A protein has these predicted regions:
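Structured, helix-rich domain cores that form ligand/interaction pockets
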Residues: 1-263, 268-326
Length: 326
């Protein structure tokens, strides 16, 4: 397999906890019981209730929505890319979804390049050569470019309509991840590489992602086969994608990278140092630079509750002493 599933939405008629058991059966790299449903919250999009899908008691992987007369007995499971990265047995998920009345409603399939094999300009060139047109269609789908004057902000291309059954995104994933982790601007280009994958550093400028979002709208049906053979569905999204899948290397099956958690934590510490480092140094000059003084100041300034942002990012699940994302 060369592509990966980066978003999963399905509806179902069983209880949310039955759906949880089905998803647990497909998990890998983690003890299934560590993935659970959080407390009930007010629902969205017409559902009466919702519960977060939580890993290790803190990291949110998605949401399950349920209840409400207008939903006619349906519930909805929404799992982000972070959640999908923990699924190992997609074949079991495809096998057991029918047992809970499950139907796929949205599946995003992505192809990553980490070594600069594909660039933003390559995608633009392919579009202008008509390589995103469907067969027997005269015009290419609409293209939208999103970019700023700052190269490290990253560039994005949208192809097609957001509400249609097929919507394509092509973007500089490395820069996007650094922005999400709030990496200080000076650090983005100073580093020799970031561990977007475990054990393998890559330049953020070389990490590019191409992604197709398939939705069950306008009469389009998403078969369960997409869970076990995403490469073929990605290839069918555009002639350009077909050529990329043919030349791309097979994807290594490995645990998700903890890059975002490590980098988010390091960035938060850097921001804290810049904002409050001067205050802390002044207090040490005033009260004495000793271990005892530092301990008292830490206790005095430390909040009773951890940062909500770091909790939701899964930073509290990192091993003690983690310094680099691997």
């Amino acid at each position: 397999m060369k592509t990966l599933i980066d978003y999963l939405r399905f509806r179902f008629t069983a209880s949310p906890f039955q759906a949880l058991e089905v998803v647990r059966s497909a998990l890998g790299f983690v003890t299934p019981d560590l993935v659970d449903l959080g407390g009930s919250e007010k629902g969205k999009d017409g559902w009466q209730y919702r519960r977060p899908i939580i890993l290790g008691g803190d990291e949110i992987l998605g949401y399950v929505d349920y209840g409400g007369e207008s939903q006619r007995g349906w519930s909805r499971w929404d799992m982000s890319g972070a959640g999908c990265s923990w699924i190992y047995r997609w074949d079991l998920l495809a096998q057991f979804l029918p047992s809970i009345g499950g139907e796929l409603r949205r599946v995003d399939v992505a192809l990553d390049f980490f070594g600069g094999e594909v660039s933003h300009d390559d995608v633009l060139s392919a579009y202008h050569r008509g390589l995103f047109k469907k067969p027997h269609v005269g015009r290419s789908p609409k293209l939208k470019k999103v970019e700023t004057s700052c190269p490290t902000d990253g560039r994005t291309i949208y192809i097609g309509a957001r509400t249609s059954s097929r919507f394509i995104r092509c973007y500089e994933k490395g820069w996007e991840l650094l922005a999400k982790a709030k990496v200080p601007e000076g650090f983005k280009t100073a580093s020799s590489g970031f561990y977007f994958r475990r054990n393998t550093p890559s330049s953020p400028a070389d990490y590019y992602r191409l992604e197709v979002e398939l939705k069950a709208v306008d009469g389009f049906f998403i078969p369960l086969d997409i869970l076990t053979n995403p490469d073929s569905f990605f290839s069918g999204a555009a002639p350009y994608f077909e050529s990329l899948v043919e030349s791309a290397p097979s994807r290594l099956v490995q645990p998700p990278s903890d890059f975002l958690q490590v980098q988010t934590l390091q960035s938060s510490m850097e921001h804290c140092s810049r904002a409050y480092g001067g205050l802390l140094r002044s207090l040490l000059e005033l009260y004495g630079d000793t271990v005892e003084t530092k301990a008292r100041l830490f206790d005095a300034l430390c909040s009773q509750n951890p940062s909500d942002r770091l909790v939701k990012a899964g930073c509290l699940s990192l091993p003690v002493g983690a310094e680099n994302a691997r």
